[in-house]
């Protein structure tokens, strides 16, 4: 069996594809981490973010929303100098703002996991694509998720980023049919 065509020979990318991408994630804090990381890739490749993921975790308190939400402008100033992450002020500020929006949702009785999964009726959607060209970059579900996140104050959550998030967190499974990770193909 082969892997999806977007996977390079980089061992980090292979491990991500084989063990994380498309696997349903139901932990609210992990989903929070992923929506933040997906926003960091805007205009860049995912491998760039993936290679910096451990640095992001260190800089953003393992994506603990309470600790991230408490970060201030001096933290932003420090982080824009940190070569271990993408030094884009707006993206750094977005993570902090997204933590605050996440906490507001939780405080309002809207668990992030339930909110996110509601856009696929709490069931992973399996695409039956045989080639990468058949896989969309956005859908009506990612459009709706993007709109709803923005309404709640999230940033860097356009429809394409939301669709990448949905793929990464297993809301949709876009492994191509011939991929070793397509449902039913794993030993």
From Swiss-Prot:
Binding site for Zn(2+): 4, 17, 175, 179
Keywords annotated in UniProt: DNA damage, DNA repair, Hydrolase, Metal-binding, Zinc
Coiled coil: none
Activity regulation (record text): Activity is controlled by product inhibition.
Alphabetized GO MF terms: DNA-3-methyladenine glycosylase activity; metal ion binding
EC number, as in UniProt: 3.2.2.20
A Pfam family: Adenine_glyco
Any single biological process term in GO: base-excision repair
Organism domain of life: Bacteria
Keyword DNA damage: yes
Entry-linked Gene3D superfamilies: Hypothetical protein, domain 2 (1.10.340.30)
Catalysed reactions, semicolon-separated: Hydrolysis of alkylated DNA, releasing 3-methyladenine
Primary role: Hydrolysis of the deoxyribose N-glycosidic bond to excise 3-methyladenine from the damaged DNA polymer formed by alkylation lesions.
Name of this protein: DNA-3-methyladenine glycosylase 1
Originating organism: Escherichia coli (strain K12)
Name of the gene encoding the protein in the UniProt record: tag
